[in-house]
Swiss-Prot record:
InterPro entries xref list: Mal/L-sulf/L-lact_DH-like_ah, Mal/L-sulf/L-lact_DH-like_NADP, Mal/L-sulfo/L-lacto_DH-like_sf, Malate/L-lactate_DH-like
Name of the protein this chain belongs to: Delta(1)-pyrroline-2-carboxylate/Delta(1)-piperideine-2-carboxylate reductase
GO biological process terms on file: 4-hydroxyproline catabolic process; proline metabolic process
Lineage: Bacteria, Pseudomonadati, Pseudomonadota, Gammaproteobacteria, Pseudomonadales
Domain of life assignment: Bacteria
Active-site residues, as the UniProt record annotates them: S44 (charge relay system), H45 (proton donor), E185 (charge relay system)
Gene source species: Pseudomonas aeruginosa (strain ATCC 15692 / DSM 22644 / CIP 104116 / JCM 14847 / LMG 12228 / 1C / PRS 101 / PAO1)
pH dependence: Optimum pH is 7.0 for Pyr2C reduction and 10.0 for L-proline oxidation.
Coiled coil, from the record: none
Keywords, ordered alphabetically: NADP, Oxidoreductase
Family: Belongs to the LDH2/MDH2 oxidoreductase family.
Length: 334
């Protein structure tokens, strides 16, 4: 393993992205999310993703110099056209406008269209909670996941992220795929030659498997059976047809076998609790804290607690990167 400081991780990411002629706006936005993944010990969304970024670029499936375009479509609605660039750059452009609309209207939604997406959603919902807003974000991906009772992929991993601001300490945040696990976790098991648990995926014949490669060729499974399947369908609708963008099946067809990152849209919703509650805001937000205390007092963890603990460790001790991955990343500089 190679130990690196967070600054060193960021410097490496920036060098690689610049080497491949990404615009400076893309360089900074993408590097920040990759560092966030490593910092929070979320390796599936860390610097390993650079391999996919560059592969997607070489396949011609992402625009390195795309300039996102903002469309103000209603008092509580806006749209950012990523023009084929990475989602992070488009999100950054739209964020201040989403904040302004949510504070003005009490609730606002932002669609990010025609973007290439690989980022963890918790990075974005945390940006909204830092501004005191309640946040919800979701996006389809490629059709990798079979519906409950089926054997062929039709859904993406279709994550859902939620954030709730808290007066002291980190926000209440969860970000999970509606599949049993993020696809990146299976890919990391494949890289390490490790078996996956039963319930993560099936092979090409629809049979349960512990072989990571077989699951990647076959289909992933939803979490919770029909419940996860219904939520996956909801994500397809909210961040696909509702915002005029692709479903996961359409994204995979657009990919044309290049194995690039998913292409499509993302939906973000921001709610200002103080506009919703008015003069009684403090009273009701305090009741939320009572709920959280009741969870923790039982010895249970709040979602993302491990990430926040990892964040403190990484700031102090740095992070570790597998040597093989480090060599692959350095090769991208050649």
């Amino acid at each position: 393993m190679i130990r690196m400081t967070l600054d060193e991780v960021r410097e490496l990411a920036v060098r690689i992205l610049r080497r491949h002629a990404f615009s400076e706006a893309h360089v900074q936005a993408v590097a920040d999310t990759l560092v966030a993944g490593e910092r929070d010990e979320c390796a599936s969304h860390g610097i390993w993703r650079l391999l996919g970024c560059i592969a997607t670029l070489k396949a011609g499936k992402v625009s390195a110099d795309a300039e996102p375009e903002l469309h103000d479509i209603a008092p509580g609605l806006l749209r950012v056209d990523a023009h084929g660039g990475f989602s992070q750059c488009a999100f950054r452009l739209g964020l201040p406008h989403l904040l302004e609309k949510a504070r003005s209207q009490g609730i606002a939604a932002m669609a990010v269209n025609r973007c290439v997406h690989f980022s963890a959603l918790w990075v974005e919902v945390e940006a909204l909670t830092e501004a005191g807003l309640v946040a919800l974000a979701t996006t389809p991906s490629h059709a990798w996941v079979a519906p409950a009772g089926g054997r062929k992929p039709i859904f993406g991993t279709n994550p859902i992220a939620f954030g709730w601001p808290r007066p002291d300490g980190p926000p209440f945040v969860f970000d999970f795929a509606t599949s049993a696990v993020a696809r990146g976790e299976i890919q990391l098991h494949e890289r390490a030659g490790k078996p996956i648990p039963l319930g993560w995926g099936v092979d090409e014949q629809g049979e349960p498997t512990t072989d990571a490669s077989a699951a990647l060729r076959g289909a992933m499974l939803t979490f919770g059976g029909h419940k996860g399947s219904a939520l996956a369908a909801m994500v397809e609708l909210l961040a696909g047809p509702l915002i005029g963008d692709l479903t996961s099946a359409e994204s995979l067809a657009y990919d044309e076998g290049s194995r690039s990152s998913p292409y499509g849209g993302e939906l973000l919703i921001a709610i200002d609790p103080r506009r919703m509650l008015g003069a009684s805001a403090e009273e009701h937000l305090a009741r939320a804290e009572t709920l959280f205390e009741g969870i923790v007092e039982q010895g249970a963890r709040l979602p993302s607690q491990r990430r926040f603990e990892a964040r403190e460790r990484s700031a102090r001790d740095g992070v570790t990167i597998p040597e093989a991955l480090h060599r692959e990343l350095l090769a991208l500089l050649e």
